[in-house]
C-alpha cells in the first residue's frame, strides 16, 4: 500500500486505498463517502443488561463523518477568497522551490498547470470545503473537498507535487 504524505508537514493525507485520479497533471482527486462511526469503545461494565437504559441501545455515540477526513485525521479550516489567495501563493512558491531542487524539469509544467487549476478553484470558490493535516501546519497543503455532479459524492483534491509517497 502507498501512503501519501505532505512534503512540508509530513502529515499523512491519503493512501492508494482510495482510487486516486490524476487531473490536469497537477492534482489527484479521491472519491470518498460519508460513513457512520461509533465514538469510543464498546464498554459494558454492567452485569445485568436489562438494568441499563434502553436508550443506550440506540445510535447514541455515533456520528456521520467523511471516511477520508476521519481516517487521516484532517481538520476543517476556512478561507475567504483573499486569504486563500494569500495562502496558495505562499504554498505554490514553497512547492516550486522543492521542485527546483528535486525535479527541475517539472517546474514549468507545475507553474502552468497550477495557475490554471487555481483559477478553476477561485471560479467555484464557494463550492469548496478546506481541510488541513493533523499537525495543523499553516504552511502545509490545504486539502480541498467538493461534490461530484450528483451532489452526493464527496471528493478530495490533493496537489500531486505537494505529496510524497511511501510504501507501507
UniProtKB/Swiss-Prot annotation:
Boundaries of every TCTP domain copy: 1-168
Pfam family membership, one: TCTP
PROSITE patterns linked: TCTP_1, TCTP_2, TCTP_3
InterPro entries, alphabetized: Mss4-like_sf, Mss4/transl-control_tumour, TCTP, Translation_control_tumour_CS, Translational_control_tumour_p
GO cellular component terms given for this protein: cytoplasm; cytosol; nucleus
Coiled-coil blocks: none
Keywords: Calcium, Chaperone, Cytoplasm, Phosphoprotein
Domain of life: Eukaryota
Sites bearing Phosphoserine, chain numbering: 78
GO terms (BP aspect): cytoplasmic translation
GO molecular function: calcium ion binding; guanyl nucleotide exchange factor inhibitor activity
Location of this chain's protein in the cell: Cytoplasm
Family recorded in the similarity comment: Belongs to the TCTP family.
Biological role: Involved in calcium binding and microtubule stabilization. May be a guanine nucleotide-free chaperone (GFC).
Protein name: Translationally-controlled tumor protein homolog
Gene: p23fy
